[in-house]
Amino acid sequence: MTWSYPVDPYWMVALKALLVVVGLLTAFAFMTLIERRLLARFQVRMGPNRVGPFGLLQPLADAIKSIFKEDIVVAQADRFLFVLAPLISVVFALLAFGLIPFGPPGSFFGYQPWVINLDLGILYLFAVSELAVYGIFLSGWASGSKYSLLGSLRSSASLISYELGLGLALLAPVLLVGSLNLNDIVNWQKEHGWLFLYAFPAFLVYLIASMAEAARTPFDLPEAEQELVGGYHTEYSSIKWALFQMAEYIHFITASALIPTLFLGGWTMPVLEVPYLWMFLKIAFFLFFFIWIRATWFRLRYDQLLRFGWGFLFPLALLWFLVTALVVALDLPRTYLLYLSALSFLVLLGAVLYTPKPARKGGGA
């Protein structure tokens, strides 16, 4: 089935693009505060609460501090690439969010609740996410520091291990819907049910790979403080360092919006059609989920991430892609996928609950 969508005038597209940029920058500022407060609650402490009422002006204080700190360019750095790298990271982080639909057509004051609508939207998102790593790689190369270079090389190598699984996981909804358009994927879910019910393994792979792509714990290897001092941005300070943090948080927010769009119905819900509210709640849930993971999980070693990407994410995504392709090619009932997806969930649940814990070494009390 194909759906048609009205096209907005250019001035409205430009206005919505501006709103997205301003909204993401504001969300970045306050997500730093929210994450610090939540991590503090997980760790039984207070968190930042001194600047302004309830600490709400802490992001402003952080911004002022970052802007007015000394901006150092180390002597051995390639100055042009050193300055260019954080800009590349931020630009490509911002480019993905404009495709995400937040409501049905015409629900934004008579206009469309997205910036642009591309028939090749999934390919566009995949390309933008791939290009974003150039900022990290250039920062490591241009810094002239072995720690920065190792951090950027880690990011480039790990990218290959999880991006293959992520790409194959995206093909499951594409095969079922028959479209690369994000709006088509949301509308299909409105009529047939959420895609994670038909493709739980693909949903799981995409969720994990999204954490790796956003460099969130337990996959924040490119900036492992214990091993690489500060990772690829070791030599950065002031506003340039803040730009890298901005890019990381925007990836974090974008991933939290893409997961419900692709697998959890986007702005749709079986009850109470309040699209913007449901989309906001779904995004907020995954933001909290990622912060929860950061508070409770340890960081994987570099070799563990590569083994996990090649040994679990890629085979699982490939297997589910082949299963979905077989069902679609033979025109079998889609209920087969529902049963297989439920079975895979039960297998995962059983593995989590009944896997024996390794015995402790040593004889300490």
UniProtKB/Swiss-Prot annotation:
Family annotation (InterPro entries): NADH_UbQ_OxRdtase_su1/FPO (IPR001694), NADH_UbQ_OxRdtase_su1_CS (IPR018086)
Enzyme Commission identifier(s): 7.1.1.-
Pfam families: NADHdh
Keywords attached to this entry: Cell inner membrane, Cell membrane, Membrane, NAD, Quinone, Translocase, Transmembrane, Transmembrane helix
Recorded superkingdom: Bacteria
UniProt catalytic activity: a quinone + NADH + 5 H(+)(in) = a quinol + NAD(+) + 4 H(+)(out)
GO MF term set: NADH dehydrogenase activity; oxidoreductase activity, acting on NAD(P)H, quinone or similar compound as acceptor; quinone binding
Record text on subunit structure and interactions: NDH-1 is composed of 15 different subunits, Nqo1 to Nqo15. The complex has a L-shaped structure, with the hydrophobic arm (subunits Nqo7, Nqo8 and Nqo10 to Nqo14) embedded in the membrane and the hydrophilic peripheral arm (subunits Nqo1 to Nqo6, Nqo9 and Nqo15) protruding into the bacterial cytoplasm. The hydrophilic domain contains all the redox centers.
Its job: NDH-1 shuttles electrons from NADH, via FMN and iron-sulfur (Fe-S) centers, to quinones in the respiratory chain. The immediate electron acceptor for the enzyme in this species is menaquinone. Couples the redox reaction to proton translocation (for every two electrons transferred, four hydrogen ions are translocated across the cytoplasmic membrane), and thus conserves the redox energy in a proton gradient required for the synthesis of ATP.
Cross-referenced PANTHER family: NADH DEHYDROGENASE SUBUNIT 1, NADH-UBIQUINONE OXIDOREDUCTASE CHAIN 1
Protein name (record): NADH-quinone oxidoreductase subunit 8
